[in-house]
């Protein structure tokens, strides 16, 4: 059924105006961005095809322009609009660096990353660089891929820490499986970073593992050396 054949209150744009965006299904929100359908199919059906191809809503962000255009009814212009919208949605969860954020607990560190990282479908290793008052100076992505102690080298982490004149750091990475149990590689990486931090005088305060709407602090879990 084409959009124009739907009852007025069931059309995505009209429904958003009347009830608010929270009342629309994922496919209806995407349909607004897609705007028009293809011959014999509404923009909602095109949106449903896109979600089906991505396998889940959170994996839409990973699709390339060419991937998006594989869906019949989506050309380059529509793909660009969708890609831009997905990126904006991702950036909304990145803390504003102009706002001073003080880390006083593992929960604070987890909150800084949780909303953004728990949806990633790949592992990502990031670092929070802190000043002497544990205020965030900056954060950087150090590595993307499966965490391995031979790949996540302390040299790269502390090179950046020195560059930003950090007094301390907190490292964070995610488990796409949702399980926050530390692996042997996680534990080994943590110990190596602790040792290097002691030598350089830049303390590793914690290693946070992000899972599916939850986190684990390796300090609280007893994985840190005294």
From Swiss-Prot:
Hydrolase keyword on record: yes
UniProt-listed GO biological process terms: proteolysis
Keywords from the named record: Hydrolase, Metal-binding, Metalloprotease, Protease, Zinc
Coiled coil: none
Gene Ontology MF annotations: metal ion binding; metallopeptidase activity
InterPro entries: MPN, RadC_JAB, RuvA_2-like, UPF0758, UPF0758_CS, UPF0758_N
MPN domain boundaries: 102-224
Keyword Hydrolase attached: yes
Residue ranges of the motif JAMM motif: 173-186
Recorded superkingdom: Bacteria
CDD domains: MPN_DUF2466 (cd08071)
Assigned protein family: Belongs to the UPF0758 family.
Record protein name field: UPF0758 protein Sca_1264
Source organism: Staphylococcus carnosus (strain TM300)
